[in-house]
Amino acid sequence: MEMDKRMKSLAMTAFFGELTTLDIMALIMSIFKRHPNNTIFSVDKDGQFMIDFEYDTYKASQYLDLPLTPISGDECKTHASSIAKQLACVDIIKEDISEYIKTTPRLKRFIKKYRNRSDTRISQDTEKLKIALAKGIDYEYIKDAC
């Protein structure tokens, strides 16, 4: 399965800055009934720990245009508490995905927009995103416009 263009468009426009890789994993489980093939312990450009989820041809971080760097086994010790916290969240999500979605307002909104927004509207949002990025316009402005 390839990365879903509708989901990517919504994540980069209407939900820019609101979602995490954990949210993306939960959305993929809920919408597509897919579990990740692999879990990758990573850090972002600021050194903040994040779990990335690998699927057949993409990673959860790609939905967010988030460049993550995998960490080594030695670095895991430094991030042990964050790893434990995020793995606990993963277990909670996997245990009852529908309950997790129901109790997370931004994910409920995302799924509602994903299911109800027309392909035309999502295509228009994607086109706005491409034009704005080509002109160097900030993501926050794009989010407000969509």
Curated annotation (Swiss-Prot):
Stretches assigned to coiled coil: none
Transmembrane regions listed in the UniProt entry: 10-32
Membrane topology: Single-pass membrane protein
Main location: host cell
Swiss-Prot/TrEMBL induction comment: Expressed in the late phase of the viral replicative cycle.
Known function: Contributes to the formation of crescents and immature virions (IV). Interacts with phosphatidylinositol-3-phosphate (PI3P) and phosphatidylinositol-4-phosphate (PI4P) lipids in order to form virion membranes. Mechanistically, mediates proper formation of OPG125-hexamers, and hence the honey comb lattice and spherical immature virus.
Keywords associated with the record: Host cytoplasm, Host membrane, Late protein, Membrane, Transmembrane, Transmembrane helix
GO CC terms of this entry: host cell cytoplasm; host cell membrane; membrane
Name the UniProt record assigns to this protein: Late protein OPG112
Key word 4Fe-4S present: no
Subcellular location: Host membrane; Host cytoplasm
Family to which this protein belongs: Belongs to the orthopoxvirus OPG112 family.
